[in-house]
């Protein structure tokens, strides 16, 4: 549910603990 300091595209998130909720990465 928290935001990651990352945006996601086809390749996903730089932080492997985050998931893509386009266009942002989220974690918990």
Swiss-Prot record:
On whether Disulfide bond is a keyword of this UniProt record, the answer is yes
- Per its record, how is this protein called by name? Kalata-B12
Q: A biological process (GO) annotation for this entry?
A: defense response
User: Where in the chain is the Cyclopeptide (Gly-Asp) cross-link?
Assistant: 1-28
Family listed = Belongs to the cyclotide family. Moebius subfamily.
Role, per record:
Probably participates in a plant defense mechanism.
Q: Keywords in alphabetical order, please.
A: Disulfide bond, Knottin, Plant defense
What UniProt notes about the protein's domains is: The presence of a 'disulfide through disulfide knot' structurally defines this protein as a knottin.
Q: Which SUPFAM superfamilies match?
A: Cyclotides
Tell me the superkingdom of the source.
Eukaryota
User: Which cysteines are disulphide-bonded?
Assistant: 4-18, 8-20, 13-25
Posttranslational mods = This is a cyclic peptide.
Q: Which InterPro entries match?
A: Cyclotide_sf
- Reply yes or no: does the keyword Disulfide bond apply: yes
Q: Which organism is it from?
A: Oldenlandia affinis
- Report TM segments: none
């Amino acid at each position: 549910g928290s935001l990651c300091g990352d945006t996601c595209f086809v390749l996903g998130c730089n932080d492997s603990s985050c998931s893509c909720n386009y266009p942002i990465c989220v974690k918990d």
